[in-house]
């Protein structure tokens, strides 16, 4: 059964390869050169040292030697290359699944085939067992993986001593067990992979793409004195910014062959553009507040006309926080006298307040700080003087001073009001 499936798969692969172009060879049709064949054959004849061999206790207290799966795979990659061999599971069967006291016992066998890129292959059977697990799925998983790994090691063992065939020699095992084991080398941080990007692989892949697109590219690159450009990076960045459209035409094949340099150059361009944008934004933010201040408060110079200065003073006085102005009743106050009192230094504010006997008026106190003294008469008084003069003639008997409506004088008037008999 496995042989029939293997023949069917081989016929399918051969038919698919013949249907494609003859220039591209499929896996299994590559031919080793004489040097490659001789080097691989010599490497497979070597026997493994004690560093590759592990041991464990088997049933009955017997000591068994074996090779770990990851070590076998590493050895195969060294011998044949990462793309020089492949393995496949041709068949896998579950022999038994038993449930005993809530625990599962599973046995699985698998047929594994290992094939090289020239078409030669070896196939063997592996077996995996799982005992005592409470989960049926985990038992099947463990048994299947163990069967495939065992079949892979047995199939690779058929290629030579370097892949594990020497372990079957008992005399060799006795001699190897007497040899001292070498200490594993210390971890070299330089050789460890610390980032995702591999510049050598990227450069080789880029060169391969260029070579497939342009067969004569390799000769041009070899004829060039160097693959590095003669200009510095700074000049290159400025040239690319000034002439973005013609940069693709002026680049030489020597610059195109270095993918790493182009990537770094692109990063520098983007960084420089980013910093230029940030500098422009910072300059705009600095100019905007200064322009606002210049428009809000224009400087008054000696050459400024007097009319303009008067308009600025009127506007400033009009928007001043004159809270005393809102406590004045325009109907009962003579604004002409009020302006005279203000100009004389508010003498009425120094006199004791008079208690109004005519009526009591409910007022609320404003908690905003009041300005008691003014250096300039309010402009609104001058604007309202004509209208106030008309009302002062009809209400001349009921004149009041601003001190009567001042929030600082109300508390004293209320105290006097409480002391007076009703």
Curated annotation (Swiss-Prot):
Residues 243-252, 384-401 have a biased composition (Polar residues). GO terms for biological process: DNA recombinase assembly; double-strand break repair via homologous recombination; double-strand break repair via single-strand annealing; mitotic recombination. It comes from Gallus gallus (Chicken). It holds the Pfam family Rad52_Rad22. Residues 1-21, 228-255, 281-306, 343-422 are annotated as: Disordered. Disulfide bonds: none annotated. It comes from the Eukaryota. Residues 153-157 bind DNA. Residues 12-21 have a biased composition (Low complexity). The keyword Metal-binding does not apply. GO terms for molecular function: DNA binding. The full-length protein forms heptameric rings. This is DNA repair protein RAD52 homolog. Its main location: nucleus. GO terms for cellular component: nucleus. It is found in: Nucleus. NCBIfam families: rad52. Involved in double-stranded break repair. Plays a central role in genetic recombination and DNA repair by promoting the annealing of complementary single-stranded DNA and by stimulation of the RAD51 recombinase.
């Amino acid at each position: 059964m496995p042989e029939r499936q293997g023949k069917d798969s081989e016929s399918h692969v051969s038919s698919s390869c013949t249907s494609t172009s003859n220039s591209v060879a499929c896996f299994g049709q590559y031919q080793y050169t004489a040097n490659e064949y001789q080097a691989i054959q010599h490497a497979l004849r070597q026997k493994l040292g004690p560093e590759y061999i592990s041991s464990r206790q088997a049933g009955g207290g017997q000591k068994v030697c074996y090779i770990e799966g990851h070590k076998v795979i590493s050895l195969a990659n060294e011998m044949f290359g990462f793309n020089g061999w492949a393995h496949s599971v041709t068949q896998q069967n579950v022999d038994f699944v038993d449930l005993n006291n809530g625990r599962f016992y599973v046995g699985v066998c698998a047929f594994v085939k290992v094939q090289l890129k020239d078409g030669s292959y070896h196939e063997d059977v592996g077996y995996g067992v799982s005992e005592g697990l409470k989960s049926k799925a985990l038992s099947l998983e463990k048994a299947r993986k163990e069967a495939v790994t065992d079949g892979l090691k047995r199939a690779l063992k058929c290629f030579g001593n370097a892949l594990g065939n020497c372990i079957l020699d008992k005399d060799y095992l006795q001699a190897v067990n007497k040899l001292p084991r070498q200490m594993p080398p210390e971890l070299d941080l330089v050789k460890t992979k610390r980032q995702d990007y591999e510049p050598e692989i990227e450069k080789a892949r880029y060169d391969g793409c260029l070579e497939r697109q342009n067969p004569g590219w390799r000769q041009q690159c070899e004829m060039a004195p160097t693959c590095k450009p003669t200009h510095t990076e700074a000049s290159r960045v400025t040239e690319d910014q000034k002439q973005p459209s013609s940069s693709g035409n002026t680049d030489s094949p020597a610059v195109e062959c270095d993918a790493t340099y182009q990537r770094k150059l692109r990063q520098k361009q983007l960084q420089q553009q980013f910093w230029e944008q940030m500098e422009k934004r910072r300059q705009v933010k600095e100019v905007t507040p200064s322009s606002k201040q210049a428009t809000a408060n224009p400087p008054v110079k000696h050459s400024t006309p007097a009319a303009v200065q008067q308009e600025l003073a009127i506007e400033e006085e009009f928007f001043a926080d004159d809270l005393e102005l809102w406590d004045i009743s325009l109907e009962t106050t003579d604004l002409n006298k009020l302006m005279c009192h203000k100009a004389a230094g508010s003498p009425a504010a120094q006199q004791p307040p008079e208690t109004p006997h005519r009526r009591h008026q409910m007022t609320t106190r404003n908690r905003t700080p009041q300005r008691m003294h003014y250096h300039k008469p309010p402009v609104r008084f001058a604007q309202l003087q004509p209208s106030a003069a008309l009302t002062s003639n009809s209400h001349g008997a009921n004149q009041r001073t601003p001190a009567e409506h001042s929030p600082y004088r109300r508390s004293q008037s209320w105290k006097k009001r409480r002391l007076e008999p009703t």
